[in-house]
Design a protein with these regions (language model features):
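PLP-dependent amino-acid enzyme catalytic core
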Residues: 1-133
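Single conserved hydrophobic/aromatic residue that forms the stacking wall/gate
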Residues: 132-141
Length: 141
């Protein structure tokens, strides 16, 4: 389990780089209890995935950052990694399968990442990414 101290540490690291997204009460979901929705769709990349990507990249040493990062994604994680990498001046490569729609690939490229289309599905793209991870050039996000 992740400790509260680790959560606070991550929050402190990523805070300067993220949007603060609101909690909104949901009438529909609050029938028997109070339910609030965290509107991460208002985040800079449109999802919560940016938070984890930023925390990981901000945790890398300068030496690790200099080698670049790789990730496998079908969309939002890739956008988060691409945005975080661009923000920090880190080269990023996102592996995607041929099943991923072109607009998702373009969105990630627009954020500055190199996109490699490999395999017919996410499992195959993941396998290919591991072959690149064994090279002394990348950290996996």
């Amino acid at each position: 389990m992740i400790s509260l101290d680790k959560i606070k540490e991550a929050h402190k690291k990523i805070s300067p780089h993220i949007n603060y997204t609101p909690l909104v009460y949901s009438d529909f979901l609050s029938k028997n209890r109070t339910v609030k929705l965290k509107l991460e769709s208002l985040q800079k990349t449109g999802s919560f995935k940016l938070r984890g990507a930023l925390n990981k990249l901000l945790s890398l040493s300068d030496h690790e950052k200099s080698k670049g990062v790789i990730a496998v994604s079908t969309g939002n994680h890739g956008k988060g990694v691409a945005y975080a990498a661009s923000l920090l001046g880190v080269k990023s490569t996102i592996y995607m399968s041929s099943m991923v729609p072109e607009y998702r690939k373009l969105a990630i490229e627009t954020l500055g990442a190199n996109v490699e289309i490999v395999g017919q599905n996410s499992d195959e793209a993941d396998s290919v990414s591991y072959t690149h991870l064994t090279l002394p050039t990348n950290s996996r996000v």
